[in-house]
Curated annotation (Swiss-Prot):
It comes from the Bacteria. Its EC number is 2.3.1.274. It comes from Ruthia magnifica subsp. Calyptogena magnifica. Pfam families: FA_synthesis. Pathway: Lipid metabolism; phospholipid metabolism. The lineage of its organism: Bacteria, Pseudomonadati, Pseudomonadota, Gammaproteobacteria, Candidatus Pseudothioglobaceae. One of its GO terms (cellular component) is cytoplasm. This is Phosphate acyltransferase. GO terms for molecular function: phosphate:acyl-[acyl carrier protein] acyltransferase activity. Catalyzes the reversible formation of acyl-phosphate (acyl-PO(4)) from acyl-[acyl-carrier-protein] (acyl-ACP). This enzyme utilizes acyl-ACP as fatty acyl donor, but not acyl-CoA. Its main location: cytoplasm. The gene is plsX. One of its GO terms (biological process) is phospholipid biosynthetic process. SUPFAM superfamilies: Isocitrate/Isopropylmalate dehydrogenase-like. Homodimer. Probably interacts with PlsY. Keywords: Cytoplasm, Lipid biosynthesis, Lipid metabolism, Phospholipid biosynthesis, Phospholipid metabolism, Transferase.
Length: 339
């Protein structure tokens, strides 16, 4: 089966200079991948001519879009006034079933607003949530919501847990993913009333809920899926990225202090390279907008080529696993059971 993915080529901080190169790499990696590059046609052609041989000429299509959603643009304006933006056109391709998934590094708020308007949410899901991977001591875990909803009720958090569990099950091939609820402590008496109510609902569900997890558990790999409100999730995500940058800064300072430390750094280069790779946020780039009638993956706006490739890979994996369809089917079964 050919997997077709639309790329918002003009989106993000670097636009076509990154998205096209990443797309070419993706075509080289995945032999059953077909891409739709959406954006200014002449600019896309010029960039493709710089890097692309005729090897992949039959595996991509360029679709012209005359507008771009700016990174600081109001989601409402992007939705109402920029109907020919590269983001909107790329998402429309998911709606018309021309592609299996869409990837964009554009404005998160605009991407969520346009995706909800064009694709609509799955029946039984009130609001979509953003799910991404976080590095751990033993690999990675998944976490949602990472910023789509900043004041979620317990019922919404249960929806997030259900969607996340289904997605992780099929992405990671885990029969029954373990789920933890992010809290300020593991004890039952800790946390807000909202968190306590959510915990009660999770315990009563059919999900594999194991209890509260704290901030440090995110990186221990205690569970397969961490559920939280988008406010806390986004802070945790950005804090972890900041810590990685700080660690890199201090390591560089330590190893360039004098001739001896530079020699130590030279000897330790393979170890440091592996260390940097395991913590590189770009390696985990590509967050899913779960709950939509279609697959949309959000890339970091500042993604480089390899980071954007990771986002395309995430879309490719989700499309192969038919994540949106699996979520829709499971939610439909639960609705029928509750009637």
């Amino acid at each position: 089966m050919t997997i077709k993915v639309s790329i918002d080529a003009s989106g993000g901080d670097y636009g076509i200079s990154v998205t096209i190169k990443a797309g070419i790499k993706a075509l080289d990696v995945f032999q059953d991948l077909y891409l739709y590059f959406v954006g200014d046609e002449s600019s896309i052609k010029a960039e493709l001519n710089k890097h692309l041989s005729n090897t992949f000429s039959s595996r991509y299509t360029i679709i012209h879009a005359s507008e771009v959603v700016l990174m600081n643009e109001s989601p409402a304006i992007a939705l109402r006034k920029k109907k020919d933006s590269s983001m909107r056109v790329a998402i429309n391709l998911v709606k018309t079933l021309k592609v299996n998934a869409c990837v964009s590094a554009g404005n998160t708020g605009a991407l969520m607003a346009i995706s909800r308007f064009v694709l609509r949410t799955i029946k039984g899901i009130d609001r979509p949530a953003i799910m991404g991977r976080m590095p751990t001591m033993i690999g990675h875990t998944h976490m949602l919501d990472l910023g789509a909803n900043v004041d979620s009720k317990p019922e919404a958090l249960i929806e997030f847990a259900t969607m996340g569990s289904i997605a992780v099950k099929h992405i990671e091939n885990i029969v029954s993913p373990t789920i933890g609820l992010l809290n300020i402590g593991e004890e039952d008496m800790k946390g807000s009333e909202k968190i306590k109510k959510t915990a009660e609902l999770l315990k009563a569900s059919n999900l594999n809920y194991v209890g509260f997890v704290e901030g440090d558990d995110i990186y221990k790999g205690t569970v397969n899926l961490i559920v939280c409100d988008g406010f806390e999730g986004n802070i945790a995500l950005k804090a972890s990225e900041g810590v990685v940058l700080m660690m890199g800064y201090y390591l560089k300072q330590a190893f360039t202090r004098n001739l001896l430390t530079k020699l130590v750094a030279l000897i330790a280069t393979p170890v440091l390279r592996d260390f940097k790779s395991s913590l590189n946020p770009g390696k985990y780039n590509g967050a899913s907008l779960l709950g939509l009638q279609g697959i949309v993956v959000k890339s970091h706006g500042s993604a480089n080529v390899d980071s954007f490739l990771a986002a395309i890979t995430e879309a490719y994996v989700e499309a192969h696993a038919k994540i949106s369809d699996k979520i829709s089917l499971q939610i439909s079964k639960e609705l029928e059971h509750n009637e």
